[in-house]
Amino acid sequence: MCGLQDGVCIVRESEAEYDVIVVGAGSAGCVLANRLTGAGLRVLLLEAGGVDRNHFFHVPAGFTRMLGRPANDWNHVSEPERSLNDRSLVHFKGKVLGGSSSVNGLLYVRGHRADYDHWRQLGLEGWDWDSVLPYFRKSENFVDGGDAVHGSGGALHVQRPVHRYCAPLMDRIVTASVEYGLPAIDDYNTPDPEGLAHAQSTMRGRWRCSTADAFLRPALGRSNLELRTGADVQGLILKDGRAAGVRYRLGAKLLEARSREVVLSAGALKSPHILELSGIGDGERLRASGIQVVHHLPGVGENLMDHVAVPLAFRVQGIHSANQDVHGWRMAREILKFYLFGAGVLTATPGMVTGFARIRPEAASADLQLMSRPFTSDPGAKNFGPEKLPGLSIAVCPCRPRSRGRIHADSPDPARMPKFVMNFLSDEEDQFLVVEGIKLARRIAEQPALKPHIKAELSPGSAAATDAAILEYARQVAYSAYHAAGSCRMGVDDLAVVDARLRVRGLQGLRVVDTSVLPTMVSGNTNAPTIMIAEKAADMIIEDLHA
């Protein structure tokens, strides 16, 4: 059946509606598709990107080949960041089955107990640490075995390094951190972690374990799941205060699908855009952008946040790093090592040693994340590829950044990307933590376990000797950790977009389930918390629809 709207033929699907339409087959959407269909609900899963057929999606280090490709990456670019010397930053976001879990750095980091207990203090019942821990454990299959913290038997495989690539250098970083005075830990996913440890990664043996691998593929054979790739959602169908379905483009066709409930899982840079394109947002702002107001909800697109990362680079000596393995004939050797033994540089992740430190002694929990990797980038190389001489990088990230940005549509045209800014390092506390974090990383490099192997500090270098100089360096080189969150904030106040059950306030049949609902930032990488949120949301949706 074809109806006309603004001169465009809209093809309406069969009258039989779905129970749930999930927009986005990413870290959250794949989990929802699995859990909801497992409970007998009929689900339509829409993904704007394609299938993750390319082999590089599944090789751990292969993400470096996939980022930035228009077919697989949204390639969001911010407006000039005033506090970063007016630089515009690229924000990589997966546009493929699995979403960013197919192109991220694979780190499995939950954050601190205090992050979630703070949400409960904000009035969000059921989001404290003790309430969300079962959902972390439910999804996880920790290779070392389950315990009170880790799960076993879940769909998502999580493991420590198997062959421990560049182990001598990585071990020395951990030892040096203890020599400096950080606690010695083995697991940074305990409720209150402080100290550095070898990474836990979403891998199954040698391969990446994305949510497409873990959750979606096992559900694809179910008759009550329909998956459509290349389906770019244009907006929601709203009727009498309820979300009745979605309108999406599939090739040259504009299609409509109807459902009892719609769930936006398109991520913190897409979910608020879809809401605003549908007339849900701040009324004055929508009218200024030429969008008809359907539901005034002023918090949409506000509270945007992300982890800012600032790198240090060292030239190392007398010890092996990844730099030497990725040039010339050595790269061919590494490919053989990967396929024959599941070892070598292709198993490496951006944070092979990671963990947390407490900069302010009075802080309730650690306030800085450090991520170390055994290579340094060549600024003159394509895609900032590794240098040829041995190197070590340490990135510092404030755990709970206070800087806030915003993202908004400036046109009713769905093809026009929204405008956004993170306002990185606009807050003095974030500036303080970055400066002190760089000084901390330098002190770790000075410890006996590591100092003999540090030939030189490449950046920021000796010229950055004062706090002001370090901060200026940070403004020049800081980048996004690609953890955008908060733009459809969960809360109980007038600027909240969703309530504690992730329902869009003031509307029926509409939820948001992705990082955009975070009221405040979690301490660390966001993939694991996103999966947890989806697990919890699935239970709530099933309960409500079966009521």
Q: What are the language-model segments listed below?
A:
Residues 35-38, 42, 50-52, 236, ...:
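Glycine-rich loop(s) and the adjacent beta-strand/alpha-helix scaffold that form part
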Residues 2-18, 133, 139-192, 197-199, ...:
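FAD-dependent oxidoreductase catalytic-site/capping-region signature
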